[in-house]
UniProtKB/Swiss-Prot annotation:
Lineage: Bacteria, Pseudomonadati, Pseudomonadota, Gammaproteobacteria, Enterobacterales
Pfam family, one: UPF0270
InterPro entries: UPF0270, YehU-like_sf
Name the record gives this protein: UPF0270 protein YheU
UniProt-listed SUPFAM superfamilies: YehU-like
Organism per entry: Salmonella dublin (strain CT_02021853)
Name of the coding gene: yheU
Amino acid sequence: MIIPWQGLAPDTLDNLIESFVLREGTDYGEHERSLEQKVADVKLQLQSGEAVLVWSELHETVNIMPKKQFRE
């Protein structure tokens, strides 16, 4: 189920994004990016609709994923 990120308190959203970024450990290439930069990137993806915040009832977890990969 998609959770509207706009309905979350700003601190809650930031904490969810930070947790996601720390879990993912994505390789950013030759130049490492700060945690703040990674969080800002994910927030922009949510704002643009490119990414969605998803609640998994099966696993009782929240995740962030590309919208095109989400299936209800």
